[in-house]
Structure formats: structure tokens, C-alpha cells
UniProtKB/Swiss-Prot annotation:
Highest rank taxon of the organism: Eukaryota
Glycosylation: residue positions: N46, N127, N447
GO biological process: regulation of entry of bacterium into host cell
Subcellular location: Secreted
Residues making up the signal peptide according to the UniProt record: 1-16
Record keywords: Glycoprotein, Secreted, Signal
Cellular component aspect of the GO annotation: extracellular space
Region named Disordered: 248-267
Consequence of gene disruption: Resistant to infection by the microsporidian pathogen N.parisii and displays a fitness advantage phenotype, whereby there is increased fitness following infection by N.parisii. Fewer invading N.parisii spores following infection at the L1 larval stage of development due to impaired orientation, location and angle of N.parisii spore proteins relative to the host's intestinal apical membrane. Does not affect the ability of N.parisii to invade intestinal cells or N.parisii spore consumption by intestinal cells of L1 stage larvae.
Protein name: Protein aaim-1
Function noted in UniProt: Plays a role in promoting resistance to bacterial pathogens such as P.aeruginosa by inhibiting bacterial intestinal colonization. (Microbial infection) Promotes infection by microsporidian pathogens such as N.parisii in the early larval stages of development. Involved in ensuring the proper orientation and location of the spore proteins of N.parisii during intestinal cell invasion.
Induction note: Up-regulated following infection by the microsporidian pathogen N.parisii or the bacterial pathogen P.aeruginosa.
Length: 515
């Protein structure tokens, strides 16, 4: 579309630039099948689709430098101005930021073209519009014959603008006006000179203010003329017309001369004076408002080297380790020594486990001697004889009732394999019985699977022998003592045996009570 506008420029510039100079540019337009015309508005409104608009914009973007080069070679200033107008119109419709304007153009171009095809006149209803005031101002300010033609053009343009707004919406009218302003770089539709600024109001009447007939206590304004002392026209050898101090000193002795402290005033000074009924000035009441106290920034509060711990801090606790005299020392799980349970074994082999009940006295220490390693893992029956001699049936108080060889009559007798004793807290090594196990742990030769099998065999044999006893047992049953003493060790090495022991005890005890 701008190519057509440029061809109109070429027609006017043919006196300086020949047509053959622009022939390469015209050939490029023909190759791209872009129409051209002397009227740029007609070229613009012949575009009806978005694809054609994009094609025209791309073609102009490539060909405009060709016209610029030719204008630099043989163009006049007026011709260059026409080319600049075409560039502005191209930017208005084809710039990357003109997408909204392109949409408006594609929607309203057909309606605008229909309005422009009609005959234009200067007669239309301009009431209630700003154009009426502007045209009236143009007529009042027009004092030359050439401004009359501009007024007539403005009348026609305003009617065109109003008709487009009525038939094609106000959006189309604003778009058409903006396009004309970009093309001519002037206001549209007004083309004449006008001035709508309000005239300044008449100056206020000078003189003293009118006072009321009834004098009352009020705040009146009085005009007081202050005449400052005459100032010398020459200060330090420099003529000045202002009251600003002169920074440069031309006279070396001028620093001893006093400086004027009163600024020069040409007009009267207005002061507000509070008067009473007689017209005498009254003293203004003093303000009781206290001045604001400005608190300067205080230093940071003093902080100690040991600040308070936060609520969420975790208080660390220390564990007192009992000095170990013997490396084989072991404290049973249910024995409390200084509220700390310590084990010489590693955590994986002998973990420290708390219990719900803690006894006050030390438990019964025991020495459990393991037999030689066995190759057979099958359970076997063991008959335990507490005496080396033959079993003698000793009569009891009841006739026909004899003492069982498996029942320990005197507590002073100590079996050869299992020894019972009540140790004191001062015993140096309460775990002498497990010294072989500790030695095997250090040498990494202990087989826990075989040890568990041996423990199962021993307890199976013990329970079998214990089940054959049908006599009533005393309250201090030695088998119960054995089980209580050996249970922690069995629980540590073979925990699966404990439920079996409990089942056997529960099965045997009711049977003993019946007998």
C-alpha cells in the first residue's frame, strides 16, 4: 500500500529523479504482485484479508530501503518528507506492536471504505461535540485569507469523522483519525488553528477589606506595608539586582563589612492579626503541645557470654561408665548400678536393655560351665544324680513315702557343675563363668548356632527330668532358681527357647498342685 503512496511521490519527484532511477524498486513490487496507486488510502483499503496484509507489509519492508537509496542520490527535501510519511504509515500498520491496530483495520476497513465512497459535505450535526467549540475558536482566531480554506477542510473532515462513528462505531472513527494523523503528522479532523484555553479571570479589586459594622472578636486580615532599609546598589564592587549573597569577594577588605540580613521586598507584606472588640491586637495563645522527643537509636542490649538456652535445645546427658576391674565383668539386665547399665560386650552381642522392675539387691550370681562341643544336634535325656553313692530311699515322716533322688534336701550341698552364691556389690568379677565365652568371642571362634542347639538340648533334658517329679516341691524350688538365673543368658543367645520353657512350666505346675 505504501508503494502506491511512494509512486505518487515519484510522480512529484520526476523533475529531479528520473523514472528509470526507481525502475528496480517498481520491478520488485511487480514480482511480488503488490498493487500500487497514486492514492495511498485506496491502496490501504484494498487489503481485505490478513494474509494479504502480512504479504504487503513484508514486501514494503524489503523495498523501502531501495527507495531510500534513490532519494539520497537525487531526491529533494520535499520528496524526502513524503517518503518519511510513507514510512510512518508502514510502521503504524506493519510494526510488531501493531497487532491490535491490524485487527481493528481488518474488522472495520470495509465499513470505512463504504463511508468514504459516499459524497462528503460540510453539513452535519456537530452539537454536543468538541468540534463545534473548536471550529468557533478557529473562526474567531482567523485573521488571514488562507485560514478560511483550512476551516472549510476542517468542517468536511469533522463530518466524515462523525459519519464513520455513527455507521462504523467509535472504534473505527478513532482508527481512521489516528491513521490520518500518522500520515500528515498533524491533528485530524481539525486542520485549523484554535485555542480552547479559558480566559484568565479579571483581577481582584485592590484596596482595604470591607469591615463589618458590628465589631466582634475575630481574626481579621490587615495589610501592612513594610519598608526595608535601603540597600546599596553596589556590594563589594559588583552591581546586583537580587538579594542573594555574593560568593565572590572583589574587595579584600569586604569581609569586615556587615552583610545585609533583610531581603528586599517590593510589595506589601500580609499578616494575620487577632483583634478584640475594640480593634486592639490580642496576644496569641501559646501552644501547649509538647515538642516531639526524638529518640536516637540505642545500642544493642548487652549480651552475656553464656546466653540462655532455647526452649527447643536438647540438654545433653552424660553417662558415668563404671570402672571395670576385670575385662569379663558383666552387669545383669535387671540389676541397677548407679542408674547406668554397662556391658563389656559389644552392642550387637550384648545390648543393654532396660526392664520395668529394678531389684534393690544384687541377684544371685552363677557359674555356668559349658560341656565339650558335641557333634550331634539331636536332643537327649540327662539323668542328674546329686550324690556319688547309690540312691538310698530314706523314709519320711509319712509311712511309705520316700525322698526323691532329684530333690535337694539340704541347701548347704552345692552341685559340682552349677554353683549358687549370693554375691555382694564388692565382688570384682561376677562374670567368671562366662570367661570361656568371652575368650571365644575375642578369638572369633564362637559358633552361636551350635551354642543355641546345646542350650536347647540342656533345657529339654532338664524339663524332662523336672516333669517326672510328682512330689510336692518347696517354695524355694532349686529348679526355679536355676531357670531364673539362666534365663537372661538363654534369652541373649537363644531367645526362641524361652516360650518353650514357659509352656512346660505352666503344664507342670498345675499337675503338681493337684498331687
Amino acid at each position: 500500500m505504501r508503494l502506491l503512496f511512494f509512486f505518487s511521490i515519484l510522480y512529484t519527484a520526476s523533475l529531479c529523479c528520473q523514472l528509470k532511477d526507481f525502475l528496480p524498486c517498481v520491478m520488485q513490487l511487480s514480482a511480488q504482485k503488490v498493487d500500487f496507486n497514486m492514492n495511498p488510502i485506496e491502496v490501504i483499503f484494498n487489503i481485505t484479508t490478513e494474509a494479504k496484509l502480512m504479504h504487503t507489509c513484508r514486501t514494503y519492508s524489503r523495498i523501502l530501503p531501495c527507495f531510500d537509496q534513490k532519494m539520497v542520490q537525487c531526491g529533494k527535501p520535499s520528496e524526502k518528507t513524503q517518503l518519511e510519511r510513507g514510512k510512518r504509515l508502514h510502521s503504524y500498520l506493519c510494526a510488531p506492536f501493531s497487532l491490535q491496530r491490524q485487527k481493528i483495520f481488518l474488522r472495520r476497513s470495509k465499513c470505512i471504505q463504504d463511508v468514504l465512497a459516499e459524497p462528503q459535505s460540510s453539513v452535519c450535526n456537530r452539537n454536543d461535540t468538541v468540534f463545534a467549540d473548536k471550529l468557533q475558536s478557529c473562526r474567531e482566531m482567523c485573521t488571514r485569507p488562507d485560514c478560511v480554506s483550512k476551516i472549510e477542510l476542517s468542517e468536511v473532515s469533522t463530518c466524515t469523522y462523525i459519519n464513520i462513528g455513527k455507521k462504523c462505531t467509535a472504534e473505527a472513527a478513532q482508527f481512521f483519525a489516528q491513521m490520518q494523523q500518522v500520515l500528515t503528522n498533524k491533528e485530524y479532523p481539525m486542520q485549523c488553528q484554535y485555542d480552547l484555553r479559558k480566559k484568565p479571570e479579571s483581577e481582584l479589586k485592590k484596596g482595604l477589606p470591607i469591615e463589618s459594622l458590628v465589631a466582634q472578636t475575630t481574626s481579621s486580615t490587615t495589610y501592612v506595608t513594610v519598608h526595608p532599609p535601603a540597600l546599596p546598589s553596589v556590594i563589594d564592587g559588583v552591581v546586583t539586582r537580587t538579594s542573594l549573597p555574593i560568593m565572590r569577594r572583589t574587595d579584600p577588605n569586604s569581609k569586615f563589612k556587615p552583610r545585609p540580613t533583610t531581603s528586599q521586598s517590593n510589595g506589601p507584606v500580609i499578616k494575620t492579626v487577632i483583634v478584640d472588640e475594640r480593634g486592639a491586637p490580642m496576644n496569641q495563645p501559646t501552644s501547649t503541645q509538647k515538642p516531639k522527643v526524638v529518640h536516637k537509636f540505642l545500642p544493642n542490649p548487652y549480651t552475656t557470654k553464656n546466653p540462655n538456652t532455647l526452649k527447643n535445645d536438647i540438654i545433653r546427658t552424660t553417662r558415668t561408665i563404671i570402672p571395670v576391674v576385670d575385662k569379663h565383668t558383666y552387669v545383669p539386665w535387671n540389676y541397677k548400678v548407679d542408674a547406668v547399665q554397662v556391658s563389656t560386650l559389644t552392642s550387637a552381642l550384648a545390648p543393654v536393655k532396660p526392664t520395668e522392675t529394678v531389684i534393690s539387691s544384687p541377684p544371685v550370681a552363677f557359674n555356668f560351665k559349658l560341656p565339650a562341643e558335641q557333634t550331634s544336634t539331636q536332643p537327649f535325656r540327662v539323668e542328674i544324680n546329686w550324690h556319688d553313692d547309690e540312691v538310698k530311699q530314706e523314709p519320711t515322716k509319712a509311712p511309705g513315702v520316700f525322698v526323691s533322688p532329684w530333690y535337694l534336701k539340704t541347701p548347704s550341698h552345692i552341685p559340682p557343675e552349677i554353683e549358687f552364691a549370693t554375691p555382694t556389690p564388692l565382688i570384682s568379677s561376677p562374670l567368671e563363668a562366662v570367661s570361656p565365652i568371652l575368650s571365644q568371642l575375642k578369638s572369633n571362634s564362637l559358633n552361636f548356632t551350635e551354642l543355641g542347639n546345646q542350650a536347647n538340648n540342656y533345657f529339654s533334658a532338664a524339663l524332662s527330668a523336672f516333669a517326672e517329679t510328682k512330689k510336692e516341691m518347696a517354695h524355694n524350688d532349686p529348679w526355679r532358681t536355676i531357670i531364673d538365673a539362666v534365663a537372661p543368658t538363654i534369652h541373649k543367645f537363644s531367645p526362641d527357647v524361652i516360650p518353650r520353657i514357659r509352656e512346660e512350666i505352666n503344664r507342670i505346675q498345675p499337675h503338681q498342685q493337684k498331687n
